[in-house]
Amino acid sequence: GHASSVFRDVYRKQELGLTLLVILLLINSLVMHKLVVKPLVHYIASVHRGDPMPVEGALELQSLAEICNAAFEETQETQKIIRHEAEHDPLTDLLNRGSFNRIFPICCQGKTPFALVLVDIDHFKSINDTCGHTAGDEAIKRIASQLKSAFRSEDYTFRIGGDEFAVIMVDVSEALREPLEERLRLLCDTVAGSSTGLPPISISVGAAFSDRRNPESTLFNDADKALYDVKEHGKASYRIFG
């Protein structure tokens, strides 16, 4: 009887020990899931989405997330700088020719009317030849600044060549022809009256509306034709096609 009692007591202790072990394993599993597995699942999902990692879970994982997030932010900032440099002209910080070639066709395919304005600096070669390239660069930067001031923040302003610029005025129809004429007149006057420290500068401007009544060619060619007409008749002025 005594041996049997001892055996039962040992058996109960083993049973209790196994039960406690199972409970501990379950608790450990839950803790592991909360502190390790679940955060890792969230981390992986964040990486797939391209989002910063959530700072959660075990301290080691939180530290890892913070390090990864710092690297993520640095990469995002670097990509933003690279994208800006790829899309903008380094001298003027206007959008560049590549951006024009990407944005202009999108506007042409859309249903919202817009205006294309082409701008050339008059006698730019002679400025470069007589005053040097530094003066030429200053002239380009000044025109770029005046273009940004003359048009709205929602419009796209580009430097598309050495002394050539373009502006896409969004959501503008031919019904606004007179206000655009006034804007271009003021622009030409502003440029002509602000050549302090530089030789006299003037610009020739040609424009066309996407909804013009009697197009002769593509929008770009019709705006370019208007610009050519200005150059043929003395420069330092503007013309809207049609």
Give, region by region, the residue ranges found by the protein language model.
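Conserved long alpha-helical elements within nucleotide-processing catalytic cores of c-di-GMP signaling
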Residues: 80-87, 96-115, 122-152, 158-162, ...
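Membrane-interface helix-start motif
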Residues: 1-18
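Cyclic nucleotide signaling catalytic output domains
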Residues: 157, 204-212, 218-233, 239-242
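Cytosolic-side ends of inner-membrane transmembrane helices, especially those
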Residues: 20-38
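The cytosolic transmitter module of two-component sensor histidine kinases
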Residues: 57-64, 136, 177, 216
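Catalytic core regions of nucleotide second-messenger enzymes
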Residues: 159-160, 175-177, 188-204, 231, ...
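Membrane-proximal alpha-helical signal-transduction linkers
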Residues: 32-56, 65, 72
